[in-house]
Amino acid sequence: TSHPEVTEKAKEIRPEWVLKVTGIVNKRPDKNVKQDTLNGDVELEVTNIEILNKAETSPIDVTTEGYEIGEEHRLKYRYFDLRRSRMQKNIRNRHKVVKFIRDYLDKENFIEVETPILTKSTPEGARDYIVPSRLWQGTFYALPQSPQQYKQLLMAAGTEKYFQIARCMRDEDTRGDRQPEFTQLDLEMSFVEREDVMALNETLLIDIVKKLYPGKKIQEIPFPRISYKEAMEKYGTDRPDFRKNKEDKNSLAFCWIVDFPFFERTDKSDNAQTEGEWTFTHNPFSRPQNEYIEMLMNKKDIGNILTTQYDVVLNGSEIGGGSIRNHEPEALKKVFEIMGYPSERIEKNFGHMLHALGSGCPPHGGIAWGFDRLMMLLENEPNIREVIAFPKTGEGKDLMMGSPAPITDKQLKELGIKLVK
């Protein structure tokens, strides 16, 4: 080389150092052109190297796919782990899918509305994360498990078409492939029936695959539909995997599950939120199918009432679920009565919903996608942590930041909290 000092400097450079390289771009001689390489027809004649920052020895190897490295190490040094090309691809593709969804729904006249993160504890199927109030000692906010009530209140407010890329929090027991905080595509529409919501979501999913994942093939369009009863009888699950070839990484088998029972007996439920005899299977705000509304209003034959709920399943994983909602306050009230809620509790927990529905609220319905799970399946990853920038462990720990962590005695005192040993 004509720059021996550059050669000497290059010898001291180690992996992951940050450099500023100055040079002259030259056209390669024909015999040296690399045909299948980006910029393979040029080469850089380096005239100077400036070291901007040195790096300590990397605690993990970032030149491999990373699956062979213990996950605790990968999560502890996530800022290193994210440098590997596979993780860069996952995070960048996630951005592309979010942008595609936003652009698509914008064209369909949806508006994105941010709903509160500090809200009120209400039963939605899992434990709430609780946030103590310093100004109002002895009272607590809850972090939202979903924007369910807010999006319905937006329908009462005349928003008509709402969506949000929503952060949701659920305080669940240790489960390998669950995250305490996760992302949903949440949407709600006024003046719709079940078919309208399902058609919009089916088209959006098909377009995401066709435009952003052209190498993948959707097995069947339109998506097949199967009733909950048939799914349980035939496959023993309400998340059947319809792929003809499960070895084919590019095969996507979507299906809709419909005709769910509205209620199940409390003693048969995994997460009953009531001391009553009955609890909801999916969502207390769902509307029954038209032929079952009278049964709901009369509180008769409760176990046979079918809801307008629809779940979308991909390759054996539920990636979304929604329903048409009860837009009449009396119908919603009956749901809580069937669940054994006394009228004072209904008014205290859901009075705002009943008043909003009674204010002239249009019929409405919507859906929420488990966005992390969808990305995991599109990227052929083994778990959702591979498509989240900074995930927590199955036990809900952030190994990089060291949370959850104790707070100071001063903070506890300000909040009026005493720890019981």
Question: What does each model-identified segment do?
Answer:
Residues 1-421:
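Class II aminoacyl-tRNA synthetase catalytic cores and aaRS-like
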